[in-house]
Amino acid sequence: MSTFVSLGNNKKNFYRLLQFVIKKESVLPKPIYVQKGHTIFSRKGYKTYKFLSTDKFIQFMSASKIIIIHGGAGSIINALNLKKKPIVMARLKKYNEHVNNHQVDLVKLLCSKKKIFIASKYLNIKKVLNKKNKIINKNSFIELSETIRKYI
């Protein structure tokens, strides 16, 4: 069991997602792997990577019990392709994490369809761990892919 965290490749920092992970680290499966992108970060007990090849990225996602990612469509689709339900935090303009808030709509939509968890202080990681984390059957994945495609 492990946790995989991805901040994406945006040049803007995303410390808010890392703060969420740090607050929840006592209940997260170890080891914790972080694809940090351009965000400067290191912490004892975490294995960090600036960037990963697509194959390595998928390998980490596939092997992890918990996936915590930014709200970019590509990362979300990768998790859903693996039939996993990720914990997602949208990058926000007001924190200078992105140029706009386009990730918010996608995250809200997917949460309403119960395909993702939204990263918040109220999220109970122990309950996430106790749920079956493979949530998508083939037909619902096709439907969801069409929804995302229309959105982006």
Regions found by a protein language model. Give the residues of each.
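Nucleotide-activated sugar donor-binding and catalytic core shared by glycosyltransferases
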Residues: M1-I152
